[in-house]
Amino acid sequence: MVAVQGTEDPFYYDYETVRNGGLIFAALAFIVGLVIILSKRFRCGAKRQHRQIPEDGL
């Protein structure tokens, strides 16, 4: 196949930009995950209250 000059390949990707975007997305997802996990573990000193299931409610 002969490539026609003056036309750009529509499937050419700037892999450095794609890689940097992926790394930024992965870092943000990791940080959000840590925040979610730590926010459930530390409740600012609040004691956990367990719900009691009434025996007749089953």
From Swiss-Prot:
It is found in: Membrane. Pfam families: ATP1G1_PLM_MAT8. It is a single-pass type III membrane protein. GO terms for cellular component: membrane. CDD domains: FXYD2. The keyword Ion transport applies. GO terms for biological process: positive regulation of sodium ion export across plasma membrane; potassium ion transport; sodium ion transport. Regulatory subunit of the sodium/potassium-transporting ATPase which is composed of a catalytic alpha subunit, an auxiliary non-catalytic beta subunit and an additional regulatory subunit. This is Sodium/potassium-transporting ATPase subunit gamma. It comes from Bos taurus.
